[in-house]
Structure formats: C-alpha cells, structure tokens
Amino acid sequence: MVTTTDFFFPNVDDPYLMGKIACANVLSDLYSFGIDECDNMLMLLAASTDMSVEDRAWSTRGLIEGFNDHCKLAGTKVRGGQTVKNPWPIIGGVATSVVKNEDMIMPVNAVPGDVLVLTKPLGTQVCANFHQWIRQPEKWQKIETIATHEEARTAFAYATKSMARLNRTGARLMRKYHAHACTDVTGFGIAGHSDNLAKNQLQPVIFEIHTLPIIEGMRKIDEHLGNNWKLTSGLSAETSGGLLIAMPEAAAKELISEIEEVDKQPAWIIGRVLACEPGENKSVILPNPTIIEVKPNQNFDF
C-alpha cells in the first residue's frame, strides 16, 4: 500500500482552480512511483474563519468542487476526509493505492549514462507573484518598464493550467519505458528535489543539470529584481510541478515524444547522470545553464 499526504494554502484566487491544483499536487507523489491509478482519496480542508460567512461558503464550495472534479478526471473519487476551521483556507488530501512491488518504480536505481527528463516548465511561483502585482501598484512599478499586464495574465493562465495538469501520463510512460528513478518537483525547487533524488540512489552518481525550461518571461522578471526567486539557480519553489525522471536516453526520447502526443505539452531532457566517488552523491546545476523560454499555450484537456 502506497499512501501520500499533501496540503497547502491557496496560491491562486480562483477556489475552483485551486481545488484542481491541490488534487494534482496530491496525486503527483503517487505518480512519481509510476503509479497511475489512485484507489482512494481523502480530502483535507480548512474553511477560513477570517472571511465573511458568504465568502467562506463561496470559497469552500469552490475548493471542494474543483478537487472533486479533478479526482474524477484522474479516475478516482473522494471517499472521506477531514474539515476544520482555520484563519486561512487550506486544501489537500490523502491519496492511496495498493500495488504490487513490481508495478512500482522505486526512486533509487539511476545509473551513469542515464539522462534527466522534466515534464513541466519551471517558474510557477514567479508567475503567481507577477500576476498578484497587477493589483499592487507599489510592486508593479518595479517591473512596469519590462512587462505588461497582458503578459502577466497570459503567463499566469498558463502556469495555473500547468499546475493543475495531472502527471498521470508521465507515470504510465515511466513504467512503459522502464525509468530508473523519479521525483516530483515542488516546494524545494528543481535544485532541492534533484539533490534529494541523487542522494537517494544506490549507485554513486551525480545529477548534472544543463538546461532549465522556464515559462516565457519569468527569467526576465527574476533577473530584473536581482534574482529574488533564484529561478536560474533552480531554487525557486514550484507548486504541483513536473516529474524529474532518470532513464536511458533512447527511452527518454520516446517518453518525451509520447507525452507531447498525448498531453499536447512539451517535456525536455535537462541533464545527465554521471559516476562519482562513493558517498559523494549530489545534484549540480551547471553555471550558465541553457534556458528554454517555454511559450504559454492552452492545449489542456480540462
């Protein structure tokens, strides 16, 4: 039995969409093991005591509906959970699946010669803040010479859809193409999660990241503000990010091609796995990595 628990406070102002993002985020931990079926979902919910009665009812209903609808899209359903009161809203869940050991991809078997695949672009946190600043003139004036409100809205619309996009296709294809290890990229950024994954490998390996796919325009914003989010250092937090997968290069190219065919979204080879001395496992992002500016699109099926 594999069980994962995750919850957080909203980072978008549409409760229905936030419910979808929360569901996708909870399921990503299962998906990172190559498990693409969730047998049971419990919802964890906090209703805000700092809101008016009307706003609390509206936002809580939206969170529940978004979470439930995305569970249906993922082929599962909410069968219980826990609701509490809290100063700010919280949404998340507990996802459980029962699988055979041979149907799981344990995150420990990367080998020298593997490549690293990333299935979603980086920059969601920058997008969220960028969009919020539209309503905060004192902050917007810091970037008004290099950005427009329309750019902020376009990037944010893409980022929210990316966050809500299920990593389910990636999970299924990991098994099909015999991936060696995987993690999902969330709050610790690509640098933190890749380092944790590298240190968890049975063989002495270094993960070397040479490419960072970033939502178009977010690098410009971060650099203009003195690398406040440290986006090109891989330290910017992500919400419901992509899968970081270690696997043979030929298989990686097949997986990327099929993700693009099925999900209508890009994926990238962003690094490679190298041998190292025992006890020195780590991940490094090369100085001046190649930056891919990922153009926003709305090719989503939800």
Roles of regions detected by a PLM:
Residues 1-302:
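Helix-biased detector of long, well-ordered alpha-helical tracts
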